[in-house]
Amino acid sequence: MINIWNKSKTVILALFLLFLSQVPLYYVEYENERQNLFGVANKITVNFILIGLLIILIAIMLGIKNGFYKNAKRTLEWKNIILILILIIPSVALDILFSQFIQFHHLGRMDNQIAIDSVMGSLLWFGKILGVALLAPILEESIFRASIYKIFSNNKIAFVFSSLLFTFMHSGYSWVFLIYLPMSLAVTFIYHRRSDVILKS
C-alpha cells in the first residue's frame, strides 16, 4: 500500500512539473488585446528568466526531496562524458537524416520545434541560454526519466516507456516520431546507465 502511494505521489509530481514546464511558454505566447503574441511584441526576456529561474528552483527542490538527483555527479565523470558524446553525435546525425527525409517527402511538420523556435525568437541570447541549457533539460530529466524510473520497478520497462513517452510528447502520431526517437533513446540510456550504477552500488 505504501509503495502504491509513493508511486502515485511520483505521478502527481511529474504532472505538476509538466504543468510548470508550460508556464513560460504560455507567458511568451499569450496574445494581447491586439492579438499579437505578447512575448514577441514585448521582448520579455527578463520576465521569462525570472519565471524560468523560479520554476528551476521549484523543480530542483522537489527533485532533491524525491531522490531524482541521487548520484548525479557520476554523469560528469570522464568516461560518462565520453559516452554521452559517443551517443549524442550519431543521434543528432540520425535526427538530421530523418528530418530531411520527412520534409522532402512531406510526411509531417515539426510543430513542436516550430513552437520552440517561436518562443526562442522572442528572447534575447541570455534568455535562450536559460531555456535551452537549464530549464528544458532539468524539467525533461525530472518528468520523462527520473519520475518514470521511480514509478517502474523494472528498469528495462522504464527505459522503453520513458524513451517512447518523451518521443511521443514531442511528435504526436506522425512520422516526426522518427526524428525525436534517436535522441530520446540516447539521453534515456545515459540516465538508465546511471540508475543501474545506483542500484548495483
From Swiss-Prot:
It comes from the Bacteria. It is a multi-pass membrane protein. Keywords: Cell membrane, Membrane, Transmembrane, Transmembrane helix. The keyword Transmembrane applies. It holds the Pfam family Rce1-like. GO terms for biological process: CAAX-box protein maturation. One of its GO terms (molecular function) is endopeptidase activity. The chain crosses the membrane at residues 10-30, 44-64, 82-102, 119-139, 159-179. Coiled coil: none annotated. One of its GO terms (cellular component) is plasma membrane. The keyword Transmembrane helix applies. It is found in: Cell membrane. Belongs to the UPF0177 family. This is UPF0177 protein YajF. The lineage of its organism: Bacteria, Bacillati, Bacillota, Bacilli, Lactobacillales.
